[in-house]
Amino acid sequence: MAPSSPEVSRIRNFCIIAHIDHGKSTLADRLLEMTHTLDRTQMDSAQVLDDMDLERERGITIKSHAVQMKYCSVAGDDYTLNLIDTPGHVDFSYEVSRSLAACEGALLVVDATQGVEAQTIANLYLAIEAGLEIIPVINKIDLPSSDVEGVASQIIDLIGIEREEILQVSAKAGLGVPELMEAIIARVPSPADNGHLPLRALIFDSVFDAYRGAVVYLRIVDGVLRKGDRVRFFANNKVFLADEIGTMSMKRQPKQVLEAGDVGYLICSIKDVKDAKVGDTVTHADAPADKRLAGYKDVKPMVFSGLYPVNSNEFEDLRESLEKLSLNDASLVYTPETSVALGFGFRCGFLGLLHMEIIQERLEREYNMNIITTVPNVEYRVLMTNGETVIVDNPSKMPDTARITNVEEPYVSMQIITLADYIGNIMKLGMERRGEYRNTDYLDTKRVCMHFEFPLSEIVFDFHDRLKSISKGYASMDYEYIGYRESELVKLDVLLNGEPVDALSIIVHRSKAYDWGRKLCGKLKGIIPKQMYEVAIQAAIGSRIISRETISAMRKNVLAKCYGGDISRKRKLIEKQKEGKKRMKQVGRVEVPQEAFLAILNIDE
């Protein structure tokens, strides 16, 4: 039975897109309060939807969150509003694109004190591509430093709308929120009434429940889903029974039926986390749809790093923890690997540095894992002399120089929005990081948008932090992948007493190799503790040593018991000590502390 049109016409599915820290989670709190989904007394913390400790601490949204609200309009009609709260950081744009596919409208939130930022523009383009109705909202209008007129002009230049269409709110104080609710009803289109078609539902998120297995969050695009239906997942053709379906209103609320236009959840005893692929389409097993929903792209990791347990007995625990994390995080990719220095571990693929930090912190907090992380790398393409192409995501897999014809590395196109005063500083940073400057657009008299192309390897380290510090916090950035280009890259090895430490190897541009080698040896000298024998730290390209530092041995004063006496007696004791140290050096292994692996990340400090 197709659902009646009036019901579908009363549904509004929308999301909030904004740059990090522009107040979207606070605005979501006000909407929840206005629709009586929660009252103030239940809000034990600000940002109700950011329920991970990490999200609150860092002040960012990491996971997509869906919540259903009931709202009675000024005209007295009842509406169902489904809000999908999305992340705003560079690394999490895949979460945004999936959430957008489940909506018809988007609130574009811009901070009245900051103006349009790089991530705002990136997410806005994603929303326009998805064909969403955009409602621009200027937030924080009650702050003394707000510049509402200036920001309104930026938004008009960006999406070419009338000034009257821009709403002004203060999410914290609740100003302008009632008008915003009415605008959502009036301007966001209702979902298409496709209840008569075969079932197609888009999975936009999933979480792991220890008792129920995978809980899948989905948006019903076509057809009807009933409790007890047999459903099939397009990606792997597996069939499950819909044990429980329902909607999310802060807590799960079971229902018998989900109809076209609804946003809800599905529990069907999915044991293996890999069966609930985010972005996949769910259909009926007995009367399936012909093709899956369009628009989902497979997520490709951009940054790779090795994660190793400090205690090698915890390898299986680490595997389990990563498996559970990867259900909640569709973009985390991992494969087992071994390292001579660190033993058994995993090579993990991440979307960016923030994503990597968050996974590490979640492993440590939620799963009590003690882990060592190696230097982040990107994926290189190596063309061999025999015509073969090898993908290298780990410096230890880099083939011998004699067998390489050329090496290609991934490049990204980046836009940086900043105050005009900092153009010089940013140009200098761009030159340091092998960036290619393209052009500059003036957004208004004070703010500019600069376009660069960078090798991805140059921005995965500390580029974001450096950009913030040279622009006194004003600059914001966003980047997208544009393909591979040939580069003159070499593998830089670190040797301790002539033995290479594979976990400290890095791939760098030839022009920077000497400088890196010198800095790295100096840094390691300060970190590796003194041994009973001398330790030589060397940086090498192939068989050529380009830099060296020596950690002198700790030595006991063997002459302390000689009060005066014959010089030959003293010499004999010193020679004996030397012999002992030489023997130690042959059998001794230098313990490399965790800080040494992190030293490469902040080599310029």
Curated annotation (Swiss-Prot):
Q: What is its EC number?
A: 3.6.5.n1
Q: Which UniProt keywords apply?
A: Cell inner membrane, Cell membrane, GTP-binding, Hydrolase, Membrane, Nucleotide-binding, Protein biosynthesis
Bilayer topology reads: Peripheral membrane protein
PROSITE patterns given in the database record: G_TR_2 (PS51722)
Q: Where in or outside the cell is it found?
A: Cell inner membrane
Q: Which InterPro entries match?
A: EF-4, EFG_III/V, EFG_V-like, EFTu-like_2, LepA_C_sf, LepA_CTD, LepA_IV, P-loop_NTPase
The keyword Hydrolase is assigned to this record: yes
Listed under GO biological process in this entry are:
positive regulation of translation
Positions the record marks as coiled coil are none
A GO cellular-component term linked to this record: plasma membrane
Q: Which residues bind GTP?
A: D21, H22, G23, K24, S25, T26, N139, K140, I141, D142
Known catalytic reactions: GTP + H2O = GDP + phosphate + H(+)
Q: Which Gene3D superfamilies match?
A: 3.30.70.240, Elongation factor 4, C-terminal domain, Elongation Factor G (Translational Gtpase), domain 3, P-loop containing nucleotide triphosphate hydrolases, Translation factors
- Origin superkingdom: Bacteria
tr-type G domain span: 9-192
One GO molecular function term?
GTP binding
Q: Name one Pfam family in it.
A: EFG_C
Stated role: Required for accurate and efficient protein synthesis under certain stress conditions. May act as a fidelity factor of the translation reaction, by catalyzing a one-codon backward translocation of tRNAs on improperly translocated ribosomes. Back-translocation proceeds from a post-translocation (POST) complex to a pre-translocation (PRE) complex, thus giving elongation factor G a second chance to translocate the tRNAs correctly. Binds to ribosomes in a GTP-dependent manner.
Extract the PANTHER family matched here.
TRANSLATION FACTOR GUF1 HOMOLOG, CHLOROPLASTIC, TRANSLATION FACTOR GUF1-RELATED
Its family?
Belongs to the TRAFAC class translation factor GTPase superfamily. Classic translation factor GTPase family. LepA subfamily.
> What name does this protein carry?
Elongation factor 4
Source organism of the structure: Chlorobium phaeovibrioides (strain DSM 265 / 1930) (Prosthecochloris vibrioformis (strain DSM 265))
